[in-house]
């Protein structure tokens, strides 16, 4: 449109935007907002690990792109939701952040069974959080689905000078667990955070049958019902053990 003509219309008195304006006549010129496309899938991911390893920081960096230097420890469970698009599908990702203290294990264990992906986090500057990994693997073996994708994350890479656990140690631990991936990250510096979640979701989608991925009306499609805030029933222990 000619800028001069636009200014002339604004300056004109008594009817520059009157009923005769072609842009507004009958409301035909208004562009209707298209409703957002609903998600094709809803996936649940849980983040586990010892207290203070940065589970909440990783979740909030991914969902809100924020970082809290002095976050309070999670009590029980917390969750956030983020929608991502991968492989031509819109995925509503429900991320559960679990408490690291043992006294909350009876609560948090109820969330394992419904999780399609599990992120196990330790702090590279605290050896005791790495030494706790076998304990967390027992929780996974006891309550999680055998199909759940596993990802081991060494967090706080921004504190490299205080490192107590080498990258090689993290890689070696992950290699002992069937199907477990490994990476290091920093929630503070926003390093590898998006990659953690997106790679995990991509691995989950890879394992889905092709007929489900192609059929948007499948049972895996996101329900528009309100999200449940009550944990599922505690599943029975399963005998299978992942560790080699």
Curated annotation (Swiss-Prot):
| Modified sites of kind Phosphoserine | 21, 25, 106
Q: Which Pfam families match?
A: Ras
Q: Where is the lipid attached (S-geranylgeranyl cysteine)?
A: 243-244
Reactions the enzyme catalyzes: GTP + H2O = GDP + phosphate + H(+)
Q: Which cofactor does it need?
A: Mg(2+)
- What one GO molecular function would you report for this record? GTP binding
In-chain residues carrying the UniProt-annotated modification N-acetylmethionine: 1
Output this protein's name: Ras-related protein Rab-12
Where does this protein come from, organism-wise? Homo sapiens
């Amino acid at each position: 449109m000619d800028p001069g003509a636009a200014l002339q219309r604004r300056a004109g008195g008594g009817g520059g935007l009157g009923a005769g304006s072609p842009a507004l006549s009958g409301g035909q010129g208004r562009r209707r907002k298209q409703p957002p496309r609903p998600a094709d899938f809803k996936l649940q991911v849980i983040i586990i690990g010892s207290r203070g390893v940065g589970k909440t920081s990783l979740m909030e960096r991914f969902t809100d792109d924020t970082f809290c230097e002095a976050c309070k420890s999670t009590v029980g469970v917390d969750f956030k939701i983020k929608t991502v698009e991968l492989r031509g599908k819109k995925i509503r990702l429900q991320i559960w952040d679990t408490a690291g203290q043992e006294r909350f294990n009876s609560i948090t264990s109820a969330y394992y069974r419904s999780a399609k992906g599990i992120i196990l986090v330790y702090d590279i500057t605290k050896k005791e959080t790495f030494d706790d990994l076998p304990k967390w693997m027992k929780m996974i073996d006891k309550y999680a689905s055998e199909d759940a994708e596993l990802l081991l994350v060494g967090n706080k890479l921004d504190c490299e000078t205080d490192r107590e656990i080498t990258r090689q140690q993290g890689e070696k631990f992950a290699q002992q667990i069937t199907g477990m991936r490994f990476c290091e990250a920093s929630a503070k510096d926003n390093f590898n955070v998006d990659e953690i979640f997106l790679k995990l979701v991509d691995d989950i989608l890879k394992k889905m049958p092709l007929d489900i991925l192609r059929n948007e009306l499948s049972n895996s499609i996101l329900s528009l019902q309100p999200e449940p805030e009550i944990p599922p029933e505690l599943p029975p222990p399963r005998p299978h053990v992942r560790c080699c």
